[in-house]
C-alpha cells in the first residue's frame, strides 16, 4: 500500500456489541487466532469494566471502544441501545479503516442490525462480510418477554437480512 513498497498484512475488522474485549472470551479467542494466523486484527466493541480506553493496542490487536449509554430493559430500550451502538460502531469502523485498514468484516450478533455496517463495507468497498452468529434473537426475545408479536417478527426479518447480506456465517 502507498509508496513505501511494503506490503500490508491482510486485515480483519471484528464488530461486537454485547461485551468489550478481552472480556468477551469467544471474540477475543477468535481475534487472537486471526492475529496468530498472520492477520492484522481490529475490534470495535463497547467499553466495559476496567476497559475504558477509546483505543488501545492490546496484545497486537487494535481495539476501538465506544460508550454504551445505557443497558436496555424493554423492547423500546433495546431499539435505542442498538441504534446508538450501531452509530458508534459504524463511526469506529471508518476510523479503523483509515487508521489500520482491513480487507474483511466479521460482525458478531446480537444485534441483527450489523448487516447495515457489513453491507456498507461489502457493497461500497468490496469487503467480504462474515456473520459470527452468537444468538438466535427472535427466540431470545420470546424467551425474555414471553410473547411473540411485532418485535418478534421484526427480529426475524432482521435475522434473515443479516444472513442474506453475509458472504459466510460462523456459529
Protein language model regions, located:
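Glycine-rich phosphate-binding loop signature in dinucleotide/nucleotide-binding domains
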Residues: 96-102
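Feature marks short, surface-exposed loop/turn motifs that line or immediately flank catalytic pockets
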Residues: 70-72, 137-140
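Active-site loop/turn elements of alpha/beta-hydrolase fold enzymes
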Residues: 46-48, 68, 133-134
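Membrane-proximal helix-turn-helix segments that form the acceptor-binding/catalytic region
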Residues: 94, 113-116, 120-125, 131, ...
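A short, charged, and often flexible helix/loop element on the N-terminal side
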Residues: 62-91, 147-151
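Structural motif
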Residues: 11, 103-104, 168
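An aromatic- and histidine-rich active-site surface loop
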Residues: 51, 85-89, 102-126, 130-139
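N-terminal subdomain of nucleotide-sugar transferases
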Residues: 1-63
Amino acid at each position: 500500500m502507498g509508496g513505501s513498497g511494503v506490503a500490508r498484512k491482510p486485515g480483519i475488522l471484528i464488530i461486537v456489541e454485547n461485551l468489550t474485549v478481552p472480556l468477551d472470551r469467544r471474540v477475543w479467542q477468535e481475534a487472537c487466532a486471526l492475529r496468530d494466523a498472520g492477520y492484522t486484527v481490529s475490534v470495535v466493541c463497547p467499553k466495559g469494566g476496567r476497559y475504558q480506553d477509546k483505543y488501545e493496542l492490546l496484545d497486537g490487536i487494535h481495539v476501538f471502544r465506544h460508550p454504551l449509554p445505557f443497558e436496555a430493559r424493554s423492547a423500546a430500550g433495546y431499539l435505542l441501545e442498538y441504534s446508538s451502538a450501531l452509530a458508534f460502531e459504524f463511526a469506529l469502523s471508518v476510523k479503523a479503516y483509515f487508521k489500520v485498514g482491513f480487507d474483511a468484516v466479521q460482525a458478531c450478533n446480537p444485534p441483527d442490525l450489523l448487516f447495515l455496517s457489513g453491507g456498507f463495507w461489502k457493497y461500497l468497498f468490496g469487503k467480504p462480510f462474515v456473520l459470527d452468529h452468537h444468538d438466535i434473537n427472535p427466540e431470545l426475545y420470546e424467551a425474555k418477554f414471553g410473547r411473540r408479536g411485532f418485535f418478534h417478527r421484526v427480529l426475524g426479518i432482521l435475522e434473515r437480512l443479516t444472513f442474506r447480506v453475509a458472504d459466510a456465517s460462523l456459529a
